[in-house]
Amino acid sequence: MNFYLKKVEKRIKEKNYDVVIDYSSNLLKYKDFDIAIPVFAWVHFSLTFGEQLSADKIEKYKKQYKKYDKILAICDTMRNEFVDILGMDKTKVELVYNPINLKVIREKAENVNPDYEKYLKENYFLQVSRLTQQKQPEHLVDIYYKLKQRGIKEKLYFIGNGEKVELIKQKIKEYNLENDVILLGQIENPYPFFKNAKLFVHTAKYEGLPTVLLESLAFGTPVVAYDCPTGPKDILGGNSEYGELIPLNDKDMFVEKVYELINNNEKYENYKKISLIRADDFSMESNKAKLKELIENTNF
């Protein structure tokens, strides 16, 4: 056991904590790490990322997680992985969402940088993420091009940076979308853009529990997203109750659902209203109450 973990062990014993919550899922792999209180692993990633796990990998995960008193999963899909793949008892794996501070982000949305005011006056679709292979942002340019051919007027904004920027620029040039697809780069406070967006659009090929979807719901901004492993289904509902869920990598379906949504005012307004209600399920208050209940019901 390294020096850092020895310090952690000493501090835990000195402070007489009730529970330790391990975000790394690595704390209990050290045999000489010895504390006599419950330890929860709060898992923020998929075990599979949509891939088939090898027998060796499954066995490794079983050994790693069986030592914990509770597993906290941030979405139902992850929770099911522990039960279905690792064979864990359902009572040991609890659902505790990654919370968002609704009050703070809504306050930040009112603080508008004058440099961005002209962009916020436009009608636009929004994507906020690292522009990487995982997020597949180039899919959105292809989708947007087809929507432009069908007559939509909204622009498409990207907030973020990453290795896919050059590919996006190439596609923008290829499709002659220089005036319609805007790369805004990294922005310290993106929340005014969340608040004013017509739609939030998301084409990742895998996720954990994507915070950007929750932040969109917090402003009543309807979401259209790929049904990737894991997260979007847990947020938007398996039957698209809280936003449009699109089969993974189905660009044509994505085009159809976006076009339908912006031309169906009743459906659009319903998503705006229900998004705000859904966001409350992921609030700090809801998750604090859940954690408090779990700790109080743990046998010490």
PLM ranges: what are they?
Residues 4, 21-27, 43:
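Short His-centered aromatic/hydrophobic patch
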Residues 6-11, 54-73:
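Membrane-proximal helix-turn-helix segments that form the acceptor-binding/catalytic region
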Residues 77, 99:
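Carbohydrate-associated surface elements
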Residues 123-146, 152, 163-169, 252:
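A conserved mid-protein helix/loop that constitutes part of the nucleotide-sugar donor-binding site
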Residues 186, 205:
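Aromatic "clamp/platform" in nucleotide-sugar-dependent glycosyltransferases that forms part
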Residues 222-226:
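Short hydrophobic beta-strand element within catalytic cores of glycosyltransferases
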Residues 237-252, 260-265:
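Conserved acidic donor-binding segment of nucleotide-sugar-dependent glycosyltransferases
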Residues 253, 260, 267-281, 293:
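A short, well-ordered alpha-helix in the C-terminal region of glycosyltransferases
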